[in-house]
Amino acid sequence: MKRLKLLPALALIAGLAVSIGTTSAYAQTTLRVFSGGANQRPDLMRKLFDQYQAANPGVKIEIETGGATSELQRQYLSTVLNAKDSAIDIYMIDIVNPAQYFGAGWLEPLNAYVGSPADAMKPYLPVYLQSNVVDGKVAAMPGFADAMFMYYRKDLLEKYKIAEPKTWDELAAASKKIQAGEGNPNLQGLSIQGAPIEGAVCTFLLPYWSQGKEFNDASGKLTLDKTAAVKGLNQWLSMVDAGVIKRNVAEVKTPDTVNEFKAGQVIFAINWGFAWDRFRMDKDSTVQGKVGVMPLPAMAGGKSATCVGGWQWAVSAFSKNKAEAAKLVKFMATPATSKFLAVEGSLLPTIQSVYTDADVVKSVPWFKDAANVVIAGMYTITMPVTTPAAMLIRPVSSISHQSE
């Protein structure tokens, strides 16, 4: 019943977004919000918007959804924003987009509404200061977090008395031991994404970052340590050759990893936070109660590193309702909203204190493990609009061909 108590609290916070004594708050304003696809839980966003509307009777909020993947959403948003379309006031955007979109002149600076970058971003994990502040301007506000996690078959590691691997080499050895013991030719050791999608960029960066290498210099310019990059790719290649990763990895997309792990065909799987509920709650999941979460292994002599993602709220530079839109964005970035999304939808908080909230811990126990991964994963990818994603994706997508 505690979940139901969150809504009145949110309604109170939503009401505080209206400035006392202003008449404009009671003039009918319609805000149109793009709130992503199914994985971004537009159903929960609708509940939050309803609370905001109840506390702000002069505001009506309409939702637009679309795009099953961040790539499809990015294609759509780029088309709309490039056309300077004012039909949508607020956008939910991926963590890699604020710098791109702000640099293109598509996003409204929020400093006048949320304060200085230091003040606005103080409650949030440091990665969101890095991704949402561009040239001293607040380009977007954090909505909810995401990160790549290492999911694993807890029952199989217990069966073979194997501890959580700390390095990729240890994971490969553990996989081979379990594969041999199970005698199932269809059992994969590790599932990663190698198809030409954003996940392949993270696949490339995980062993690269683990070696202590950065992808951006202090000015934001793309840099690449070729020796570390080759070493990381060779790590994946060796696991393909050993039969730990399947040979057609260049075809594997995010849903493929989820579905194969659910079907009991994978021992270790790298995927985003949303996958946890899929493994735990989907009716066709064969691994319910058998899944563990651990930090991603490191390269030998390196450190664990993960790809932190998440979704941000931004105001369109072409909106005709910027002030009202900014008020709604501010509400959607509050700790109370973050708590609601965590309890109701298992969406990872962008605010560290929410991870230890008693209601959150009770409702989503696995967050106690997730917190360490997200907090430690202070990395993100910042690329200008013109950077070809293929520059990063191609090396990963070619792994299976190199192993033939």
Feature locations, PLM:
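Short, well-ordered beta-strand elements
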Residues: 28-38, 59-64, 89-90, 139, ...
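Extracytoplasmic "Venus flytrap"
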Residues: 31-47, 66-70, 146, 198, ...
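Short, polar/charged alpha-helical segment
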Residues: 39-60, 393
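Extracytoplasmic "Venus flytrap"/periplasmic binding protein-like
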Residues: 50-127, 133, 155-166, 259-260, ...
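Conserved C-terminal helix/tail region of periplasmic/extracytoplasmic solute-binding proteins
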Residues: 60, 158, 180, 241, ...
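Hinge/lid segment of periplasmic solute-binding proteins
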Residues: 95-147, 163, 172, 183, ...
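Glycine-centered hinge/linker elements that transmit conformational signals in sensory
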Residues: 174-179, 219-250, 296
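C-terminal lobe and pocket-closing loops
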Residues: 273-288, 299-395
